[in-house]
Amino acid sequence: MSKTTKKFNSLCIDLPRDLSLEIYQSIASVATGSGDPHSDDFTAIAYLRDELLTKHPTLGSGNDEATRRTLAIAKLREANGDRGQINREGFLHDKSLSWDPDVLQTSIRSLIGNLLSGYRSSLFGQCTFSNGAPMGHKLQDAAPYKKFAEQATVTPRALRAALLVRDQCAPWIRHAVRYNESYEFRLVVGNGVFTVPKNNKIDRAACKEPDMNMYLQKGVGAFIRRRLKSVGIDLNDQSINQRLAQQGSVDGSLATIDLSSASDSISDRLVWSFLPPELYSYLDRIRSHYGIVDGETIRWELFSTMGNGFTFELESMIFWAIVKATQIHFGNAGTIGIYGDDIICPSEIAPRVLEALAYYGFKPNLRKTFVSGLFRESCGAHFYRGVDVKPFYIKKPVDNLFALMLILNRLRGWGVVGGMSDPRLYKVWVRLSSQVPSMFFGGTDLAADYYVVSPPTAVSVYTKTPYGRLLADTRTSGFRLARIARERKFFSEKHDSGRYIAWFHTGGEITDSMKSAGVRVIRTSEWLTPVPTFPQECGPASSPR
C-alpha cells in the first residue's frame, strides 16, 4: 500500500455539515447587479449567484423527488394532449403568419424532400442498438451485444422491418438458429415512460423504446444526420453553435432561440405535412404508437418522444427547414446553426422565425431566447460580450471532501479571461480550500473531484484508493498519467456470439482493443494543461469585470 493511500485511510472524508448554503452566501456577498441576462444591469457573477442552487435537491425553492416526477409526467401528458388537438384540427390558426402559410409549408417540404432524396437504400446502413436500457430490459442487460444475443423486443408494426434487417445479417441468423431463439421477436405494446433529474423544480420525462424499434430508429437518425451535414448542420459538433453564440454576444448579428419541450412538441400531423409520404410511412411503422405510464397504456399523439432513436435528428431537420424557408422568403443569406432545439439565426429575421415556429406549435423558452442585447446561450455555452460566463451548479450536498474539491475547481475555472480566474472569488476559494488537506493540492483537471487544482505543482502519479477514487501524489513529477481499465471475464459463449454480431455491425475492424491483455492502459496529456490563476496568486489583484 502506498504512503498516499495510507494517509487517505486516516482522513475523515465527510465534512461536519453541508456547505452548499455557505458557498452560495459567499458568492452572493460579492455579487452585484442583476442575474437576469435580459436586464441592462446584468452581471456575470450575479448570474452565477442566481443559478448556483437551482439544481440542488433540497435547498432553494425546489420540490421533493416525488413531486418533480409527478410534474414531469403531467407536463408530458399535457404536451401529448396538445398534439392531439393539432392532429385533429390542424395547426394553431390563432398563431397567424405575416405571410402565406402555404408558401412556407411548400418551401419546407421542398427543402426536406431535396435533403432526403434517395433515402430508400440508406435507412438500414447504420442501424445499431444503443447502450441504454430498452423497454423490457434491465440496465445490466443494456449492452448492445446482449441485445443481439437475447430475444429482442419490438412493436407489432415494426416487426416486418425488424425481420428484414435481421435476415440480411448472416451471423445474426446463425445465432438465432444455434441457440433456438424465436424468429418472432418478443412483441411489446410500445415504449415506457421514465424520468431523469432536470432541476430542483421538475424532472425531465423520456421513454425507453423496444430493442428493435430503437435499432431501426437509429438507422434513420444516422441517415438524417449525414444529410444535414451536407448542408452545414453538423450534429456531431456542438462547438459550431457555441462559436456562433459567442459571435452573437459580441456583435449582436445572431440570435439564439431555445424552445420549451421541443422534443415533446412534434405532432403526427407535422411530420406527415413535411416528409415525403413513403418516408413518413416508414417512420410511422417503427415508432412507438403507445406508451406505458405508471402501468397505464396511453396512445401517443406525439410522433416521437425523447428517447426515440431519431427524435433528435428529426427535430433538427424540421427546425433547419423552418429557419431556411423563412430565410429564403425574406431574402436573408446569413449564417444559421441548428443542434436539436438550439437554434441560431440572423437577428434580423429572428422575429419571423419565432412566428413560424409558433404557427407549427412550438413555444419559445423566452427566458433562454436572446434576440437583442449582448448575451447569448446555445448548447450549454453562455456568453456575455464574448466571455464565457456559464454558471456551475451545486447539484448535491457539499458534505464531503470530494464534493468540496469539485466546487473549489469550479470556482477557479469560472469566468476565466486570459488565463485569470475571477478575483472576486479568490477569498471564497481560500476560505473553503483551508478545509482540504494539503496532500490533495495540485493537478490541472478542473472537472476533477479528487484533488484541488492549484498552481504551480502538477499532479504526476495516481494511486487507487479503497473508495475507487484516484489520488494525486504531488511529491514527484514527470510521470505520465494513466487510467487502468480491467477487462471483464467469464462472458458466456452465447454472449460472445452477441459481441461478435455487435462487432460485425461496426464494420469488423481489427483493433488493439480486440486483444485480451487483462488490462488496458490509457495515457492522458493532463500534465500539458495550463492552470487558471487568481490574480492574487501572482501579484496585485486586477479590477473586476
Swiss-Prot record:
InterPro entries: DNA/RNA_pol_sf (IPR043502), RNA-dir_Rpol_cat_phage (IPR007096), RNArep_beta (IPR005093). It holds the Pfam family RNA_replicase_B. It catalyses: RNA(n) + a ribonucleoside 5'-triphosphate = RNA(n+1) + diphosphate. SUPFAM superfamilies: DNA/RNA polymerases. It comes from the Viruses. Signal peptide: none annotated. Residues 243-373 form the RdRp catalytic domain. GO terms for biological process: viral RNA genome replication. Part of the viral RNA-dependent RNA polymerase complex, the other subunits are probably the host ribosomal protein S1, EF-Tu and EF-Ts. This is RNA-directed RNA polymerase beta chain.
